[in-house]
Amino acid sequence: LDIAYFGESPAFDALLAMLGESPAADFGPLPADTLAAASFTLAAPGDAENGELLAGLDMLAAPASFINDILPKLGGPSVVFMGEADGENELEIPVFGMALRMDDDTVASELNAMMDKTMLLANLATLQWETDPIRFNRGDYQGHGYRIAEIGAPLAQHTGWPEFKAMQVVYGRVGDYFFVCTGEHFFHQCIDAHRGEAPLRVRFDGPVHERATTPIMSIAMKPEGLADMMRTWRAVLGDEGLELDLSLDVPMIQTELGQNIELLDPFDAMTMQLWRGEDGLVVGRIQLTAPE
């Protein structure tokens, strides 16, 4: 399935402007239980039309500068991924992660400081919520040290959802990567994948679009696993809780995932790649694979 973006969406245009050239299919050491992943490279503000996100990261990096001190030490691409983990009441909860490849490993200390500051700011929110504070611990797995922010208890108290109790923010350096995950088990899988001890369950293998010039993002999914997770949460939240507006200021592009879960079932793999094509046009290719 080939796609092309001709719309005029400020939100989508701002997102696309922040994406630089990215290796076509480089996902790095993904956790074994990954259900979806996206690989991309952030463009420097001088090359992007909108540097607001990077300016916000600059604030978290102070007194260092994310744009001038940290970003130049990162190698592309960055990867975000999601999977699922055991939660309360035997309910599988979504877990998320991010991997930043480092060209200069001295940047790990600056990234740790950014995450520490982010968690400190998050802890201030618990004062307004009048909940337990976020508690901090350290962990070690296979010789890799990392930091843990126990965000689950205050989130569960604030929302009334005990399923959130298992949520954590776990972060640290693993080789040439800096990982951030919302679960310690997921972080351990990142370490296992980096050591080559866990199989990569999501693979990307898609043809290049004939109008492509610059690859900007690659996405890989396990549709069946995502469908199972959404069915579980539809039973908990109801259909309205899974409605997702994907319009991005383009009203013709809308869907309600809660009503269309079954569309994912026939496929065991889905990949998508986006490129900048002729005259800046964004083109893409989606490839769906059914079991043999």
Language model features by range: what are they?
Residues 1-292:
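Signature of soluble extracytoplasmic/periplasmic domains of secreted precursors
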